[in-house]
């Protein structure tokens, strides 16, 4: 039986989030609605999650000493990584020592912190279908890994840093002239300085989806796996622009997608939500990536599901029942900063909300960049295409000024 103490009391149930952006903010809100005391951690002040948590902390989460000192001082019941750039070896050590429970597990946080760990697990350990790939530690290695005459992945292909966020550093290559530029772009977009990339042969897929996969306790107290309806999405430069739910799939493709998602998440273990990214070509499904946390494309669930992805995550990690039922078809569209400024102002909010059956989420980020995600428009409709048009219309009516 799950018990939850009163926040700010000696018996409080305390949860620490490592990473307090827009996704972490929504997880914090979901936890607070269940009476949990929250600690929001990020590398900069006034992050979105800092603005609503009981406690806000600023550290370098890649610094093992700072991370250990904070966790030992705060003594949370659960530590929930919300980003990849964390000293995961420290989390593994603290979990082994019995200091704290990491969500979903410290091993999962380590394996998914970079594209090499999770790709090797999926393709080489679990034998799941993926695009052809190689890992490279220099420009020369990258050129050799692509060269089709030497058994490389050939063109077109995609180059990504081993660790990056929101598509940073990713590029598609159509020929040899693109290689050096792609290497430099990957190095600039990487969150760490290990100078390694993954190059993937291009999969000529029909569409790509995120399959939100939830591991939560069932009625018998054992962990069960359940799935949300498939989420379709469109990306630009590796970054999500819009998403919609449900995305139509054949029964065969859906079964394959669920099999792949179940295989990966069961191996990673623990409880919580996982965003499993998949490419689909006909009935063939290819594994791409997995995040052991809510997914940016899953923000659409804030308008489509009875329990959105953040509520599902909060419930699952606390040992509470979950419900992945779809409430309505819907869509999300990103609101970009469009300006380089701090303390921006949002205009046109009233105009945006006049679009039928729409909602807005403005993230409260303290600084805007041209392509920074500052908010999201949500729309529901029985027809997905109508929802997509309305979400895009609402997002376009919001203006950001410095």
From Swiss-Prot:
All copies of domain ATP-grasp, residue ranges: 120-318
Q: Any one Gene Ontology biological process term?
A: 'de novo' IMP biosynthetic process
Catalytic reactions on record: N(1)-(5-phospho-beta-D-ribosyl)glycinamide + formate + ATP = N(2)-formyl-N(1)-(5-phospho-beta-D-ribosyl)glycinamide + ADP + phosphate + H(+)
Q: Does the keyword NAD apply?
A: no
For ATP, which residues are the binding ones? 115, 160, 165-170, 200-203, 208
Q: Which GO terms describe its molecular function?
A: ATP binding; magnesium ion binding; phosphoribosylglycinamide formyltransferase 2 activity; phosphoribosylglycinamide formyltransferase activity
Q: At which positions is Mg(2+) bound?
A: 277, 289
UniProt keyword annotation of Metal-binding present = yes
Q: A cellular component term (GO) from this record?
A: cytosol
Where along this sequence does the record place binding of N(1)-(5-phospho-beta-D-ribosyl)glycinamide? 22-23, 82, 296, 365, 372-373
Give the EC number(s) listed in the UniProt record.
6.3.1.21
- One family from Pfam that matches here is ATP-grasp
Provide this UniProt record's keywords sorted from A to Z. Answer: ATP-binding, Ligase, Magnesium, Metal-binding, Nucleotide-binding, Purine biosynthesis
Associated pathway:
Purine metabolism; IMP biosynthesis via de novo pathway; N(2)-formyl-N(1)-(5-phospho-D-ribosyl)glycinamide from N(1)-(5-phospho-D-ribosyl)glycinamide (formate route): step 1/1
Q: Which domain of life is it from?
A: Bacteria
The enzyme's first-digit EC class, named in words, is ligase
* Subunit note: Homodimer.
This molecule's function is given as:
Involved in the de novo purine biosynthesis. Catalyzes the transfer of formate to 5-phospho-ribosyl-glycinamide (GAR), producing 5-phospho-ribosyl-N-formylglycinamide (FGAR). Formate is provided by PurU via hydrolysis of 10-formyl-tetrahydrofolate.
Q: Which family does it belong to?
A: Belongs to the PurK/PurT family.
This chain's protein is named Formate-dependent phosphoribosylglycinamide formyltransferase
Species source reads Mycobacteroides abscessus (strain ATCC 19977 / DSM 44196 / CCUG 20993 / CIP 104536 / JCM 13569 / NCTC 13031 / TMC 1543 / L948) (Mycobacterium abscessus)
């Amino acid at each position: 039986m799950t018990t939850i103490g009163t926040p700010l009391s000696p018996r409080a149930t305390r949860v620490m989030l490592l990473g307090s952006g827009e996704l972490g903010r929504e997880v914090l809100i979901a936890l607070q609605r269940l009476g949990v005391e929250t600690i929001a951690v990020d590398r900069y002040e006034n992050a979105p999650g800092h603005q609503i948590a009981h406690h806000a902390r600023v550290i370098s989460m890649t610094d093992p000493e700072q991370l250990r000192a904070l966790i030992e001082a705060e003594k949370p019941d659960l530590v929930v990584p919300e980003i990849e750039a964390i000293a995961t070896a420290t989390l593994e050590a603290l979990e082994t020592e019995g200091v704290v429970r990491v969500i979903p597990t410290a091993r999962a946080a380590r394996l998914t912190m970079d594209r090499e760990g999770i790709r090797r697990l999926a393709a080489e350990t679990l034998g799941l279908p993926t695009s052809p790939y190689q890992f490279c530690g220099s420009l020369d290695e990258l050129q050799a890994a692509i060269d089709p005459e030497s058994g490389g992945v050939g063109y077109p292909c995609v180059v990504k840093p081993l660790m990056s966020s929101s598509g940073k550093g990713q590029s598609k290559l159509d020929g040899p002239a693109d290689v050096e530029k792609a290497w430099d772009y990957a190095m600039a977009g990487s969150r760490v300085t290990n100078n390694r990339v993954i190059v993937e042969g291009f999969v000529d897929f029909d569409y790509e989806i995120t399959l939100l996969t939830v591991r939560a306790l069932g009625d018998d107290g054992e962990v069960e796996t359940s799935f949300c309806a498939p989420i379709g999405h469109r990306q630009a430069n590796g970054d999500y622009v819009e998403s919609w739910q449900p995305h139509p799939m054949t029964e065969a493709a859906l079964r394959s997608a669920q099999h792949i998602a179940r295989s990966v998440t069961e191996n990673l273990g623990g409880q919580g939500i996982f965003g499993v990214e998949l490419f689909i070509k006909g009935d063939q499904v290819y594994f791409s990536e997995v995040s052991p946390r809510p997914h940016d494309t899953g923000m659409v669930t804030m308008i489509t599901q009875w329990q959105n992805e953040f509520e599902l995550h909060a419930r699952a990690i606390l040992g509470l029942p979950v419900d992945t039922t779809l409430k309505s078809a819907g869509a999300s569209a990103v609101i970009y900063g469009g300006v380089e400024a701090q303390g921006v102002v949002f205009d046109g909010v009233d105009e945006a909300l006049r679009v039928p059956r729409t909602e807005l989420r403005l993230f409260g980020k303290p600084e805007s960049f041209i392509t920074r995600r500052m908010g999201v428009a949500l729309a529901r409709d029985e027809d997905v295409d109508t929802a997509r048009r309305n979400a895009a219309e609402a997002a376009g009516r919001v203006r950001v000024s410095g």
